[in-house]
Amino acid sequence: YNTEEAHSLLEVNASHNDKDYILAINWKKAAEHAAKGDFDWKPCKYAHNVMHEDTEQATSEILNKVKVIDTRKYNDFLYLIPCPKSPHGVDVDPSGEYIVGNGKLSANLPVFSFTKIQDAIKNHQFDGKVDGINVIKYESALHGEVQSPGLGSLHTEFDADGNAYTSFFISSE
């Protein structure tokens, strides 16, 4: 999320602030809202694709409406987490506990904790709101930062031994 809300010359105009945002969605809570009917139907045309595991074939169906939850009414499932400079990829380790925010214009690599994020939400550790969405305090969500591993982290992948591998524009190796 581009905190400058720039709409032109993005690489220049959307890079002034030290931190932008990762939008975290509690999809289980969103599903609860949908199940309760807290949505409006909006017309649109899209392909709904389904992969059938038994036949290893996919089918497509063209649909003409979608459920939309008005987040001005129901925003208890959306949270913003500050992340250094233009987050590109947000990657989760196999345990689901650690979330790496890859800021493509940052020299540091923040690692967030799912448990700390949940605690921050429960304890209302917010730094205000943006468009009605609570901003979780950076320190409240942060597990730690990898200092100066390179510049322009893009994505982090994990192996079975818990090691993380991050791709960069410029590496410090």
Where are these regions (language model features)?
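Predominantly soluble domains enriched in secretory-pathway, periplasmic, or organellar proteins
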Residues: Y1-E173
